[in-house]
Amino acid sequence: MTNTRKSHPLIKIVNHSFIDLPAPSNISAWWNFGSLLGVCLGLQILTGLFLAMHYTADTTTAFSSVTHICRDVNYGWLIRYMHANGASMFFIFLYFHIGRGIYYGSYTFMDTWNIGVLLLFAVMATAFMGYVLPWGQMSFWGATVITNLLSAIPYIGPTLVEWIWGGFSVDKATLTRFFAFHFILPFIITAMVMIHLLFLHETGSNNPSGMNSDSDKIPFHPYYTIKDILGILFMMITLMTLVMFTPDLLGDPDNYTPANPLNTPPHIKPEWYFLFAYAILRSIPNKLGGVLALVLSILILMLFPILHSSKQRSMSFRPLSQCLMWMLVANLLILTWIGGQPVEHPFITIGQLASVTYFFIILILMPSTALMENKLLKW
């Protein structure tokens, strides 16, 4: 008689995905971030659901309802801060996950990679709309500034902005629709994650060497289930330390002031995980140019499979490319720092240089260095 997990129509899908899945024997801790992102998504949906039970999407009561959650709801403060800091953890893991993909050449799985980039856009949209919901000063002005960027689109721009706002400014209609989208998007993301995994399981996982590992596979369970659980444990320790000791460390103090359309905060800036893109946006003095640079800074990820010019898949055995990879990481950290600084000298110049360097490394230095390495290896 066949084992139920191998014969049951539903359980066998789980079995082929998480239990009997043949996995490379040498994947490192960099391959833990996929499962950590899955746990983060589950945690965000769960905490978000409980927050939605007490939140009211109305301009007059939104701010008060968040205060009510923190003060009066049983463990409301815990749920709220787990949700807010969970988003930060989500993005840390996302960036590590993408960085891993770039370093080890995982982008050669083009279907998996492209749906991953779309997932990144969906998560960024969800996080942006979630930041608007507490209806603090930074929520309101962040929403105003970012939605206003669409007015740079020729011809249809201004109409499009008013259509998204549901009026002539960010108001009640905007908040209500942002709540609706913020609620539904995580479920769409979950469906996209399933497609992401479907494409991944068509090819099997990549590994640090970048070589085919069909000759050396091990079952996912128990080897990688236990490894994932260890990763989840570390994640929960980090998250709960953040939530319990410094819950507002990554937030903006301005968001503890209720939204006021008549008073602009001195420095409008998004959450830390968008600062690199915000710095690129601000570095171009033209509105449309800035918006294009902003979109391209993320969309450029889709070019990685096309720009790959090395005969080797991974960067594991390519020291020059490794140097460039870490230059790119340092560059992104500089952009993140600049995004949080006021628009004044010398930050403007640093931001412009870092923005140019970002595109220069990806579009020119990385492919040309890969070609040079091929030559050095007489390939």
Swiss-Prot record:
Membrane topology summary: Multi-pass membrane protein
GO molecular function: metal ion binding; ubiquinol-cytochrome-c reductase activity
GO biological process: mitochondrial electron transport, ubiquinol to cytochrome c
Binding residues annotated for a ubiquinone, in chain numbering: H201
The organism's place on the tree of life at top rank: Eukaryota
Binding site for heme b b566: H97, H196
Cofactor mode of binding and number, as noted: Binds 2 heme b groups non-covalently.
Required cofactor names: heme b
TM spans (from-to): 33-53, 77-98, 113-133, 178-198, 226-246, 288-308, 320-340, 347-367
Keywords assigned: Electron transport, Heme, Iron, Membrane, Metal-binding, Mitochondrion, Mitochondrion inner membrane, Respiratory chain, Transmembrane, Transmembrane helix, Transport, Ubiquinone
CDD domains: cytochrome_b_C (cd00290), Cytochrome_b_N (cd00284)
Keyword Cell membrane: no
PROSITE patterns: CYTB_CTER, CYTB_NTER
One GO location term (cellular component): mitochondrial inner membrane
Record-listed heme b b562 binding positions: H83, H182
Keyword 4Fe-4S carried by entry: no
Record text on subunit structure and interactions: The cytochrome bc1 complex contains 11 subunits: 3 respiratory subunits (MT-CYB, CYC1 and UQCRFS1), 2 core proteins (UQCRC1 and UQCRC2) and 6 low-molecular weight proteins (UQCRH/QCR6, UQCRB/QCR7, UQCRQ/QCR8, UQCR10/QCR9, UQCR11/QCR10 and a cleavage product of UQCRFS1). This cytochrome bc1 complex then forms a dimer.
Protein role: Component of the ubiquinol-cytochrome c reductase complex (complex III or cytochrome b-c1 complex) that is part of the mitochondrial respiratory chain. The b-c1 complex mediates electron transfer from ubiquinol to cytochrome c. Contributes to the generation of a proton gradient across the mitochondrial membrane that is then used for ATP synthesis.
Similarity-based family: Belongs to the cytochrome b family.
Leftover remarks: Heme 1 (or BL or b562) is low-potential and absorbs at about 562 nm, and heme 2 (or BH or b566) is high-potential and absorbs at about 566 nm.
Name of the protein in its database record: Cytochrome b
Gene name of this polypeptide: MT-CYB
